[in-house]
Regions:
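Secondary-structure boundary elements
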Residues: 58-123
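Long, contiguous interaction/recruitment modules in multidomain scaffold/adaptor proteins
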Residues: 111-253
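Helix-start (N-cap) detector for alpha-helical repeat units in TPR-like alpha-solenoids
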Residues: 209, 250-251, 284-285, 318-319, ...
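Position-specific recognition of the canonical hydrophobic site in helix A of tetratricopeptide repeat
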Residues: 220, 227, 261, 292-295, ...
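Canonical positions in the second alpha-helix
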Residues: 241-242, 275-276, 309-310, 343-344, ...
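Structural marker of alpha-solenoid helical repeat scaffolds
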Residues: 245, 279, 313, 347, ...
Length: 386
């Protein structure tokens, strides 16, 4: 999940937060939590298309994708692979062999790329894909060879927050699960086995919402990183597709707000962030982005309240501490700003902006020696990046 809207504030830039999902490679047994068994979870490709059209009748035919729609050639290869090993009597053995084959150079030979969402045919053509892409191929093939496989959203357990230039990227995690003799057996292409205690099985249509959300993010992220024109309207369309198929998909509402902000439609942006918060009061990203808008509008009190709410949800976010500190600094509350900047640099030691403002706080308090120590730290960080 991520946000991507640089904003000018007193000569500084506030990054937006955008949300996406990335991947996990191991098989393990784990427990399941939060599954809504009252709804259908898995579909055949044909029934999936029918259900999606019913959910989103306004969707154009060319926009509809079956994320797990493996090609006949891929199915033939998978079946031949398992037939060559007649001793694979158990489902867990078959699942393990299939999972390893996807990344085996002598089999499917796929590699992992964090920013590469694509349907199975394109993933195979490229030879790489992200967590959703690789997991989708596994799930599609597993079902074709008679295994029961589902998507898993493990974002509440596996989550990465990082900064790329002016973008704060908040990445969750999609993986898979197979029903075997040992119960739920987890399929993970990134090695975070120790992180799993419980997980949430999601239905195939929610996986499609993740697919569209990821595509929108990648359009923004790749263009910004390459310093190319950003296809914001295309990204906006993908976030809207995610909401079409799952109206309660909070991440897409948040990211929709990011693009509206970039396009200068701040009212629509604020409405999108508020919708995300109403749907999920624990969505710190939407609080963060809405707070950025409030700061941009000069509503420092409103921004401070929203940053504080976001931190109640997620205390380990250095960018939230920094932005709250920036508001406190502008309000003249130097003591509170000092504490916020200290927390930011404790969480991200190379956070230059937070170090610089901490030094400014010390200077204004007459603590010159401490200010110079912080400035020296900044110089060491910069020297290490040269």
């Amino acid at each position: 999940m991520l946000f991507l809207h640089p904003e000018g504030v007193s000569g500084r830039r506030i990054s937006g937060v955008i949300t996406t999902t990335t991947l996990l490679t191991l098989l393990m047994a784990a427990g399941c939590a939060g599954t809504q068994w009252g709804q259908r979870i898995a579909y055949s490709p044909a029934s999936f298309m029918e259900a999606t059209r019913a959910q989103a009748p306004e969707m154009l035919a060319e926009d509809l994708v079956v994320p797990f729609g493996v090609t006949p050639e891929m199915v033939v290869r998978a079946k031949a692979l398992l037939e060559r090993m007649p001793l694979l009597h158990t489902n867990i053995d078959r699942a393990n062999r299939l999972m390893k084959a996807l990344t085996d150079e002598d089999e499917f030979g796929l590699t992992y790329d964090a920013v590469a969402t694509s349907p199975p045919a394109i993933t195979m053509e490229r030879g790489y894909g992200n967590c959703l892409a690789l997991t989708s191929i596994f799930i599609g093939l597993a079902r074709e060879v008679g295994l029961v496989a589902y998507y898993v959203d493990a974002s509440n357990r596996i989550n990465d927050l990082r900064r790329e230039e002016e973008i704060i990227v908040d990445s969750g995690h999609i993986a898979g699960v197979v029903m075997t003799e040992k119960g739920y057996t987890f399929v993970d292409y990134d090695g975070h086995v120790s992180e799993y205690r419980t997980f949430e099985i999601i239905d195939d249509i929610t996986a499609l919402a993740h697919y569209y959300n990821n595509l929108g993010f990648e359009m923004l992220f790749n263009a910004e990183r390459a310093e190319e024109p950003v296809p914001r309207e295309e990204a906006l369309h993908n976030f809207e597709l995610a909401i079409m198929v799952r109206p309660d998909f909070t991440r897409a509402h948040n990211n929709l707000g990011v693009v509206h902000t970039q396009l200068g439609d701040l009212d629509s942006a604020a409405a999108a962030y508020r919708t995300a918060i109403e749907m999920d009061p624990k969505t710190d990203a939407a609080y963060h982005n809405l707070a950025n808008l409030r700061m941009r509008a000069g509503d420092l009190g409103g921004a401070l309240a929203l940053y504080t709410q976001a931190l109640e949800v997620r205390r380990d976010n250095p960018y939230l501490h920094y932005h709250r500190g920036l508001v406190q600094y502008r309000l003249g509350d130097l003591g509170a700003a000092e504490e916020s900047f200290k927390r930011a640099v404790r969480l991200e030691r190379d956070y230059i902006e937070a170090h610089n403002l901490l030094a400014q706080v010390y200077y204004q308090q007459g603590r010159l020696e401490e200010a110079e120590e912080v400035k020296a730290t900044v110089q060491r960080i910069l020297a290490g990046k040269r």
